[in-house]
């Protein structure tokens, strides 16, 4: 019997394109490395407020840089990223609270669907420039991910409950206590120690901490590796 898998907590918000990149890479490696990946829906607005930080898009020069960087990241990570036409306006203004509460509900009620539903919501906002704030938009993403319409509607009815709100706050507070100042934030529990890593470009360092092999953002499949 081999060593127990190391726990990795990924704190993310679908409003963050860099969260999507980190999410996809960790999902690719979860069957290649000896890890147990825990997805934790989080509110980036709460982390920014708690840390006193600003989203990169809100800093003019960083915003200009993002427009140049995203097309390169799309190719490098092989994730279909496209900047929404009005991201700095309506997309940011509307936020992601309904989507993140829905994902929190999924994590509580049907966690095996969390990866797929999270991905479909990212696909809407960060690939197809579609809404993620209206209930029907979230429902469409959940159904596309493979959830039944009835189940998705049931979960939508729960997003305004105090239990779900508290869980999302709990996740956000946990990220802040680890020292998060943005997303994605990955927390690795290795040999009794805890390491907090920020961003989608720290995953090679994560591999080093885990004692695992880094094979780039798009590693071979488990079968190919064997």
Curated annotation (Swiss-Prot):
The keyword Acetylation applies. Its EC number is 2.5.1.18. Belongs to the GST superfamily. Kappa family. Acetylation of Lys-93 is observed in liver mitochondria from fasted mice but not from fed mice. The modification N6-acetyllysine is found at residues 68, 74, 85, 93, 116, 158, 165, 167, 177. One of its GO terms (molecular function) is glutathione peroxidase activity. One of its GO terms (biological process) is glutathione metabolic process. The gene is Gstk1. Glutathione S-transferase that catalyzes the conjugation of glutathione to exogenous and endogenous compounds. It comes from Mus musculus (Mouse). It is found in: Mitochondrion. Glutathione binds at residues 16-18, 53, 183, 200-201. It comes from the Eukaryota. This is Glutathione S-transferase kappa 1. One of its GO terms (cellular component) is mitochondrion. The modification N6-succinyllysine is found at residues 36, 49, 68, 74, 93, 116, 144, 158, 167, 177, 193. InterPro entries: DSBA-like_thioredoxin_dom (IPR001853), GST_Kappa/NadH (IPR051924), GSTK (IPR044088), HCCAis_GSTk (IPR014440), Thioredoxin-like_sf (IPR036249). PANTHER family: GLUTATHIONE S-TRANSFERASE KAPPA (PTHR42943), GLUTATHIONE S-TRANSFERASE KAPPA 1 (PTHR42943:SF2). Transmembrane segments: none annotated.
């Amino acid at each position: 019997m081999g060593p127990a898998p190391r726990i990795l907590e990924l704190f993310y918000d679908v409003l963050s394109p860099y969260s999507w990149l980190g999410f996809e890479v960790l999902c690719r490696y979860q069957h290649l490395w000896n890890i147990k990946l825990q997805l934790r829906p989080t509110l980036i607005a709460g982390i920014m407020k708690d840390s006193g930080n600003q989203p990169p898009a809100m800093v003019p020069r960083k915003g200009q840089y993002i427009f140049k960087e995203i097309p390169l990241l799309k190719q490098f990570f092989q994730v279909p990223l496209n900047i929404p036409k009005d991201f700095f306006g309506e997309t940011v203004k509307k936020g992601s609270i309904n989507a993140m509460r829905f994902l929190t509900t999924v994590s509580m009620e049907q966690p095996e669907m969390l990866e797929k539903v999270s991905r479909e919501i990212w696909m809407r906002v960060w690939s197809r420039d579609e809404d993620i704030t209206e209930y029907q938009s979230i429902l469409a993403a959940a159904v596309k991910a493979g959830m039944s319409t009835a189940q998705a509607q049931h979960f939508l009815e729960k997003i305004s409950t105090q239990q779900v709100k508290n869980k999302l706050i709990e996740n956000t507070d946990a990220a802040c206590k680890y020292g998060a100042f943005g997303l994605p934030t990955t927390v690795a529990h290795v040999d009794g120690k805890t390491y907090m890593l920020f961003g989608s470009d720290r995953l090679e360092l994560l591999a080093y901490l885990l004692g695992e092999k880094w094979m780039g953002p798009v590693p071979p499949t488990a079968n190919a590796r064997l």
